[in-house]
Amino acid sequence: MARLTLDGLRTILVACAGEDDGVDLSGDILDITFEELGYDSLALMESASRIERELGVALADGDINEELTPRVLLDLVNGAQAEAA
């Protein structure tokens, strides 16, 4: 099973919710909250659904919130994949 990378996460975010004009997703966004990146809870839930469909990783609703950072989300997804392997 392929690990989710930051580039892969960027692709999912843009596909699910678009890209805020004021945010450069190509920069170092690992430790910026999704709220600061312009993604609300609905966008994050759509992204989580896509992660589940594409990678087979179901994230708990309590894990997904606007204070989450891409680094933490990547750790959650990749950690769940490692446990399932």
Curated annotation (Swiss-Prot):
GO terms for biological process: antibiotic biosynthetic process. The keyword Phosphoprotein applies. It holds the Pfam family PP-binding. Residues 3-81 form the Carrier domain. 4'-phosphopantetheine is transferred from CoA to a specific serine of the apo-ACP-like protein. The modification O-(pantetheine 4'-phosphoryl)serine is found at residue 41. Keywords: Antibiotic biosynthesis, Phosphopantetheine, Phosphoprotein. Acyl carrier protein. This is Granaticin polyketide synthase acyl carrier protein. Pathway: Antibiotic biosynthesis; granaticin biosynthesis. It comes from the Bacteria. The keyword Phosphoprotein applies. It comes from Streptomyces violaceoruber. PROSITE patterns: CARRIER, PHOSPHOPANTETHEINE.
